[in-house]
Amino acid sequence: MNRSRHVTRRSALQLGVAAAALPLVHIRTAGAAGKLTVGFWDHWVPPANDAMKRQVTAWAEKNKVDVTIDFITSNGSKIQITQAAEAQAKTGHDFLPFYNWEVNTYADLLEPMDDVVKAMMDKYGQYSPIHEYLSKLKGHWRALPSSTGTLNLNCCARISLLKQHAGIDILEMYPPHKSDPKAAADWTYDNFLKAAEACQKAGFAFGLGLGQTGDSVNNTGIIYSAFGAELVNAKGEITVDSDAVNQVLDYGRKLVKFLPPDVVSYDDASNNRALISGQSALIMNPPSAWSVAKRDAPKVAEDCWTFPCPAGPKGRYNPYNLCFFGVWAFGQNKTAAKELAQYLQERPQVQERDTAANGYDLPPLVSMSDFDIWSEVEPPKGTVYNYPMRPWHDAHENITAYPAPPDIAAQMYARAIHPTMLAKVHSGQSNKEIIAWARNELEGFVR
């Protein structure tokens, strides 16, 4: 999974033409009362695009609106290029997908969505604190949380290997049905460390990266959160030299001994390869790795189970990549754009698209974590049942660098501060040296 990339003004100018050359789907309705141009992520599961197209067509015909749809690839940062080009030109789509801190980047150019968010919460319950952190800016919700494009990077492990080498029965902790939270009470970072050691000694090291790309940033960030270790607090104060941060580094010093030797150079495909090749007992990734294994290594896929990450002293955190629908304030048909955005996030539409995507997308509301698709997907049956966050998981959504102010957090995320600190542990640096390096980096962000 790739994280969002920063796009410069120059690259937007150079590549902005790409936005005009995207594949279009034009839905023309009889007696149209208005026009919309909307952009969506070009889903890696093609039937999900087909479902989106059907839903937009149904809404357009009912509301007498001409709608042009662009499915924009995430390859080459095309979504970010499109955002930057349109923000500069003040013209383009009526709404686009925005990921994580991209809402903050364009907050002043996005139409407030307070009315839509309120309507959704009145009907389906509250959004998470992380959604609010990323999207409620300067007193207003600037974008609507979306299921399409939202995913987490929970544990995906080999059932047989964890049981044989670490004595852990994953299905007992996280069965494919509602369970008692106490069943997973022992799934802690202490026991995670023991399991990592046992599996490494057996030749199946956990594929957890300490590289510079998104998976490494996300998968290390949850360790900091689980220990209550903030590098920068909500006030924007540097807090890197804390007991909690030292605890994370001490824990990392034990963990890195049991990770693959090339862990510092991991990219976003490395953990996938480790699982699919049969070399790793556990990775943290959405079901895309398991899905590829179904095709390329079916025996591996049949032995995989997705489940929440371990708990630390301050709780259990799962790494998320969050998507939002944002309506440009300079758009020509903002009311219709907001109405379409809301329609697409209502339960019936979310469920239809999730079914088409084989459960890959995650609804932003816990009340929608009960779709049948997660029970039905196989092999083995129920393998991704615990991929969405269930009420009894006793877990929290996490975005690395929270709760630092978004302007600062986005820079910390982009510079991969969290995994780099653990990579320095891997290279043998002391806590004091690592904290001094991190402080110097952070001071550049908070100025």
Where are the model-predicted features located?
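C-terminal lobe and pocket-closing loops
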Residues: 101, 288-301, 313-417
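Paired acidic/hydrophobic, glycine-rich loop segments that form the ligand-binding mouth/hinge
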Residues: 94-97, 281-285
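Conserved N-terminal structural module of periplasmic/extracytoplasmic solute-binding proteins
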Residues: 2-8, 12-107, 118-125, 150-151, ...
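Short, solvent-exposed loop/beta-turn-alpha elements that line the ligand-binding surface or hinge
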Residues: 115-127, 133, 168-185, 229-248, ...
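Periplasmic-binding protein-like
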Residues: 154, 225, 249, 303-326
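Glycine-centered hinge/linker elements that transmit conformational signals in sensory
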Residues: 189-199, 234-265
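Short helix-initiation/N-cap motifs at beta->coil->alpha
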Residues: 72-82, 186-191, 263-276
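Hinge/lid segment of periplasmic solute-binding proteins
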Residues: 99-154, 303-310, 382-384
